[in-house]
Amino acid sequence: MWGRRRKLRRLNDVTISTCHVSAKVGTRLVFDHDGKIIQKTPYPHPRGTTVSVKQLFSTLPVRHKEFQRNIKKKRACFPFAFCRDCQFLEGSPAMLPVQPAKLTPRSTPPHPCSLEDNVITVFSSVKNGPGSSR
């Protein structure tokens, strides 16, 4: 997976759900902490790819507690991976343990668009709060 020296996979649970434009059904891949696929199943998913990161720092209890304690300060530091066809979920349970039920989808501009457009869309939404636009 990604991260400093490709070790992010060891710090959390990673699931990738994807569906190609020509496919009738998507695929869900669940990875273990060594980066090996432990489950590959058909999954109803819209066109595109979603990367889910859960239990961030769960393998490092001290780091996990520090993360939970400082989540409000560190919130702006989580741009998450995004590409041309993806969504940004502001307030996912992994990010905000205080309010786990509040999810606000942030969609990137329609295809085709540049990486710069995606960054502007995601960060302007986070900076200006829920329901804001560029």
Curated annotation (Swiss-Prot):
One of its GO terms (molecular function) is ATP-dependent DNA damage sensor activity. This is Postmeiotic segregation increased 2-like protein 5. Encoded by one of the numerous copies of postmeiotic segregation increased 2-like genes scattered in the q11-q22 region of the chromosome 7. One of its GO terms (cellular component) is mismatch repair complex. It comes from the Eukaryota. It comes from Homo sapiens (Human). GO terms for biological process: mismatch repair. Belongs to the DNA mismatch repair MutL/HexB family. The lineage of its organism: Eukaryota, Metazoa, Chordata, Craniata, Vertebrata.
